[in-house]
Each structure stands twice: as C-alpha cells, then as structure tokens.
C-alpha cells in the first residue's frame, strides 16, 4: 500500500498475453512510466480499478503494445499527470480511444508522440482537453494512418505555449478535416506538420502566426486533396528551409496571399512546388 513507483514494472515481458491487475492498490503511485511497455503479446489487460490520482508520469505507459485491441481507461484520473509522451505509441491494433476523462488538469506539459504509430486507430475522443501548458506537440498523431475522427473541444485545445509542432499530423492519411483553432505565435518548427495528409481538403490557417518559425520543410508535402490555402497570417522572415513545402499537392488550385512568403532568409527551396 506504500508503493509509489511502478515504472518499468512489466516492461519487456514479451510473452505475457493476459494480465489482471484488478486488485492492485495503486492509490499512492506517482510514477507509471513504461509500466506495460514492449509487452508485444499482451491482448487482455484488466486495469479498470487502477487508482491513478497521484500519478505524475505516464510516459511510454502502453508503448509498443502491438497486439492489444482495447483499453478501458474510464477509471483513470489524470489530474496530476505532467508527462504523457509516447503513452500509446506503437499500439498498432487499437481502433478507438475514449479519453474524455484525460487532459483535465493544468499540470500536463508533454504529449509529444502520444499516439504515434497507432496504425489502426480510427477515432480519438478528447472532449475535456486542457493543453494550455503544453510546449511540445511534435509527432503527436504521426502515422495514425486510419484516423478519421478527432473529437476535440476546440476552445480547450490551446496551443498558445507550444514551441514544436513538427510532424504533428504526419501521415494522417484518412483525416478529412482538422478543426483546431491554432495559436502558433511561439512555434519554431512546423516541418512535416501536415505531411501525407492525403484526405485533407481544407486547412484553416487563420491562427497561424509563423513569425518565429525557422523550418517549414515538408509542411504540406503530399496533401494531394488540398484545394486551396490562404497564407494571410504567414510571416516567414525567420524561415531558413521551405524545401518540399507544397510537394505533390496535386489538386492545389489556389494559394492566396502567397506574397506573404518572405524568403529573405531562406536557404533551401528544393522541390517547393514540385508536382503541383
């Protein structure tokens, strides 16, 4: 009952298929980093009574659980969690994540790569999300090939303090739209942000202040359904790399306010509009 650290507890137990922790008392645990990571055979995990109210670190918690298809996390309290980076990364068979009880605190700082390489994930629900202290959203949904529904309360998905958005939606090739009111005034890296988003037709860039951004490489690379873009808010006076920025945007008919692209510091424009 006095245990506070369960990090790496079952990490790398590659042959365990079923794990029932119904009677575990975890009320005082503060660290669950990597607790179930790399359990590549696990397909049945019972943690519905897990007490997580004091946990501060959930990073890599289910990392590379490539055979698990369902996670019931309704009992999870995340009010004190600071780190959720790579939490579900590599959960290749999960199709749906209901996380409406997640992200409800002001303490959360890291969510980079949280859902990366969840190949079959179709839907994520995060309607109570609070991201106002997040600085790193890089690789957040990277390689979520099947993701077609992203339920987010846009007023709470705050990006005011985010510095890094590189590869945030990389290869989300089934996502038809992204409804997020982006505030990017502190972001420095947007490289590969929407790369490979094959189904995206429109992206609202109204909140895109890019005055601090230095890297726009591959930003819209392979957005082959994109019809138009308005760069009205783009300020690119600090950008050094615009290579392959609009590469293979095959249906792109119109880029409004393209004159806003200040290229005075750009060193690389290779393939910028190639294949348009």
What positions do the PLM features span?
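Negatively charged
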Residues: 1-276
